[in-house]
Amino acid sequence: MALLAIHSWRWAAAAVAFEKHKHSAVLTRSLVSICGSGLRWSSYQSGASGSARLSQTTESLRNSTQQRWEKNNSRQLLDASKVLQAWPLIEKRTCWHGHAGGGLHTDPKEGLKDVDTRKIIKAMLSYVWPKDRPDLRARVAISLGFLGGAKAMNIVVPFMFKYAVDSLNQMSGNMLNLSDAPNTVATMATAVLIGYGVSRAGAAFFNEVRNAVFGKVAQNSIRRIAKNVFLHLHNLDLGFHLSRQTGALSKAIDRGTRGISFVLSALVFNLLPIVFEMTLVSSVLYYKCGAQFALVTLGTLGAYTAFTVAVTRWRTRFRIEMNKADNDAGNAAIDSLLNYETVKYFNNEKYEAQRYDGFLKTYETASLKSTSTLAMLNFGQSAIFSVGLTAIMVLASQGIVAGALTVGDLVMVNGLLFQLSLPLNFLGTVYRETRQALIDMNTLFTLLKVDTRIKDKAMASPLQITPQTATVAFDNVHFEYIEGQKVLSGVSFEVPAGKKVAIVGGSGSGKSTIVRLLFRFYEPQKGSIYLAGQNIQDVSLESLRRAVGVVPQDAVLFHNTIYYNLLYGNINASPEEVYAVAKLAGLHDAILRMPHGYDTQVGERGLKLSGGEKQRVAIARAILKDPPVILYDEATSSLDSITEETILGAMRDVVKHRTSIFIAHRLSTVVDADEIIVLSQGKVAERGTHYGLLANSSSIYSEMWHTQSTRIQNHDNLGWDAKKESLSKEEERKKLQEEIVNSVKGCGNCSC
């Protein structure tokens, strides 16, 4: 009995240690779960008016930030940022999907309302019992069989104790009289004790085999769910990703998959078996010892369960607060580390650390509440069980005194109850963790329910296109990111197959929006877009995006080798094809000069490469994709003139015999375009060739051209003035040197 009590105490201590370890591990993951930056394209065109409104709110942001530090409350940073113009605009976006739920963005007090336990478990069990995997179903059935065997062996163990004690004390009328013990030990007791050992070994064997058999089912289910969520996130539209923080999504998926692993084991091998074992024990006590024993046992178990459920539901709110603080801390860490250079530029290391520490402080507060209430829960559980055990032992003692029960019955009752204490202690832990895991899983399965606004029509046909038919046409296209703020208003134009067309205009005129609409990142509110004479909404997304290549303004590369990033344009390409496109983009020789050649790591987002090298990689992988249509979204706007001219040369070679659209800010890069389309206030204001547009001195294009030319000329004049000043100083220095030399001519002695 003492040994069983010690084991029970160790189990409770282990449960407490497990939860504390889990809490501390969450903080560590905030720093190490750094993932890709995801999509970074701007979600809307703010224009000059947006910039003006932004500058007007700078002072209010500064005041809000100062108050936040005075109150030492990290949450006020988010409140202060809401005064920025971008925040209300984002909240009004037509592509806004709302919050994911399950603690990702939820209010801690409302988080539990989003958890539909029945639907979550039903969705999870569809992965455990898949219709297309009879092998996994067989494993589940075998595991349940081993589970039943293990529980049966557990119930047999106390009976072995009972029979052993009764055999050793078979002299009726003399309680604990062991005068003939040597004879009984040699016969019945020895056999019973051997049976006791076999029963315990059998129970352990069944449990371990069950775990081994079910392991493949659990891991396969987790892998399939994680893969489906990952693929689903990639299938969601750009608007969803622009309204989500990558760090929060990553943590939600991580916690959700870990929650699935726990719930699978708890539900199949803990909760249901515990209920089965409690029912079996109560029935045994009823038939062997009487109704009083069964009633006390059921009362104890009922009080224990009710107390555990009530307190755990109360404690769950602290877990939701911990999740939210964990998300905020993770986002702060990821954003700060991804913007390492920006932090250094402004010497804001301490600011970032204090901001991060504010979120950790919130997490710490919620974690302390969770830990303290856990201690209260454990004490209450122990008190309830101790009262029930005491009552059962008193009843058993009275039965022995009355002659209705034997000493073996006392040992059996004690063993059955202590055997229940292990699953009961585990029941508390299982319920707490299951409840919390369901909250984590809710976010995961909620993500699976988010429907993308951009998807194929039913029975969408693949795009039929060749380089000879790759005509692009916009027909009266209207589009707005934010309701009531037009970005494109009735835009119509056509790009003939094999021609180069440039689209220019001021900031916020809708140039880059055309690229996103053609690639179907968004859908126009009105009008149609045609590629090769086919409405892009009627063809499959996969075939459409395979036919269009994009060289973005900011080429974000994977944290991998140069070869991997080049191969990404066509993962089935041969090494020779990769080398060929690198040569065409003028990148091959530069790669060979690197220490590791094509195996050189490019760093996070490709930051180890120069801007020109990143753009060449983007061009090369677009070539490797070999699409009939290529889009250049201001691909050289951030480069110097020499690098820009070199890359433009590579572009000219690429676009030969292809349909190409150049989104340009520098007009000098598109003077050779077959047609130039000028956008102004979301409309096609002008169109024509470079020289044709310049012929009209009052045209928008002509004004833009002369403005840029004047800026370049002034820059050149400043350079020439600096050069002349340098030359005049050099001439003055030479003249002075000649005077010094002439002054020492004479006898040849410097002292003359």
Swiss-Prot record:
The modification Phosphoserine is found at S336. It is found in: Mitochondrion inner membrane. Residues 472-706 form the ABC transporter domain. It comes from the Eukaryota. One of its GO terms (molecular function) is ATP hydrolysis activity. GO terms for cellular component: mitochondrial inner membrane; mitochondrion. Residues 162-185, 281-290, 404-409 are mitochondrial intermembrane. Keywords: Acetylation, ATP-binding, Membrane, Mitochondrion, Mitochondrion inner membrane, Nucleotide-binding, Phosphoprotein, Transit peptide, Transmembrane, Transmembrane helix, Transport. Belongs to the ABC transporter superfamily. ABCB family. Heavy Metal importer (TC 3.A.1.210) subfamily. Exports glutathione-coordinated iron-sulfur clusters such as [2Fe-2S]-(GS)4 cluster from the mitochondria to the cytosol in an ATP-dependent manner allowing the assembly of the cytosolic iron-sulfur (Fe/S) cluster-containing proteins and participates in iron homeostasis. Moreover, through a functional complex formed of ABCB7, FECH and ABCB10, also plays a role in the cellular iron homeostasis, mitochondrial function and heme biosynthesis. In cardiomyocytes, regulates cellular iron homeostasis and cellular reactive oxygen species (ROS) levels through its interaction with COX4I1. Homodimer or heterodimer. Interacts with C10orf88/PAAT. Forms a complex with ABCB10 and FECH, where a dimeric FECH bridges ABCB7 and ABCB10 homodimers; this complex may be required for cellular iron homeostasis, mitochondrial function and heme biosynthesis. Interacts with FECH. Interacts with ATP5F1A. Interacts with COX4I1; this interaction allows the regulation of cellular iron homeostasis and cellular reactive oxygen species (ROS) levels in cardiomyocytes. This is Iron-sulfur clusters transporter ABCB7, mitochondrial. It comes from Rattus norvegicus (Rat). The lineage of its organism: Eukaryota, Metazoa, Chordata, Craniata, Vertebrata. The gene is Abcb7.
